[in-house]
């Protein structure tokens, strides 16, 4: 019973969530295992699997609690490695501001780089800005431009929340994680798991070979040619915003609502 209570305590408290491997005869301690690493390491006891199930549930509950009232979002994906002054950082900042001015809440992964830039752009125009941060081995701290942020243990929970509240997705320059998020969004739309939301890819020179790959997929019959219409590629903030307005506001009956407490961040779009 004592062991059960200790495990449940670790499950509920993020500060105690990491489990350490047993120490050897030396004074060296094995590095801590993260929750997702433990989850994916293979079969464990049924009790341990149940503990993981509850931890996943708690991740979702934290996300639902923090994000429930953020309003319709546009999620911006991109690299955590780019710094202020990089052209893609500045483009993401402008895009974040334009998305916020359109009435959407800007949602990102909550970290540095492109994520920070988009959140920062939203705050530049007093828009709403939220993040879904992830626990990493080398801690990724939330950026300083967030109205609300939830830090999660599991990547798949994070990706679900980044999709759940959004009516469009903007993909900026990034690496493997950004590609993962791009293909996840496209697959969910393609298979009808989410509505026909739009995916805007910005940085056409950077993504040129990938866009050609999509054309090759269609030519080889790996995807339907109509699937190419899911992606809108541009380097223009104005074109991107016009496309989002056309594809993400009118079709879903979103309306811009200005409330008396807009200075508290309560203004924005709502679904009719």
Role assignments for model-derived ranges:
Residues 135-141, 178, 206-209:
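Short gly/pro/ser/thr-enriched loop/turn and capping motifs at secondary-structure boundaries
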Residues 201-272:
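C-terminal functional extensions of proteins
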Residues 72-75, 104-105, 127-131, 147-150, ...:
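Structural motif
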Residues 113-172:
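Acidic/glycine-enriched connector segments
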Residues 2-33, 37-134, 141:
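Glycine-rich beta-alpha loop segments
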Residues 153-205, 251-253:
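Active-site/ligand-binding-proximal alpha/beta "capping" segment
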Residues 66-69, 98-100, 123, 140-144, ...:
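Solvent-exposed alpha-helices and their adjacent loops that cap or buttress functional pockets
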